[in-house]
Amino acid sequence: MKVGFIGVGWMGFGIAKNILKNNHELFVIANKNRKPIDRIVKEGAKEVKSYEELCKSGLDALFLCVTNSPIAHEIGKKIVSLLTDKTIVIDITTHNQNGSVEMEEILKVNNIPYLECPVMGGPVQAEEGVLGGIVGGSEENLKRSEELLKCFVKIIIILVVLEMVQKQNY
């Protein structure tokens, strides 16, 4: 699969590395910290310079692994018009109480499929591919994402209804 990744940082590096290990083509974009980007490019990822270049790469999936809801929403608003319904957004961001529901609303404007999957564990577990994941979204979107989730998640808790994932965080 062709996979994009926004947020290759502390947690994202290990997740991205495992996506590569499982023979998926990975496209990444840098933000503030060059070190994880340089490392993942050495592992075989392709670096792109803009959201437009990333979103126009014919992606099957786009991972979002950023610090919080406001950052995720800002990125969502920038990419929504660049993606098509052929790309599912898999959101690993740890959102605030309504963050993932708001993110899904942002993407719905252009019919972009969305799956929330906050993870349990840290950078070590991410690199080992043994994170826990709580998945929220439609069954169809879960099926589309399952192969990629298995690259880095050992235990998947499926809540299907997006709002249920948020309630589990509090």
Where in the sequence are the language-model features?
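NAD(P)+-binding Rossmann beta1-loop-alpha1 motif at the extreme N-terminus of oxidoreductases
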Residues: 1-57, 61-64, 123
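Amphipathic alpha-helical hairpins
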Residues: 3, 10, 14, 18, ...
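Short amphipathic alpha-helical segments
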Residues: 16-18, 41, 74-77, 101-104, ...
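Rossmann-fold NAD(P) dinucleotide-binding segment
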Residues: 51-114
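Rossmann-fold dinucleotide-binding core
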Residues: 95-170
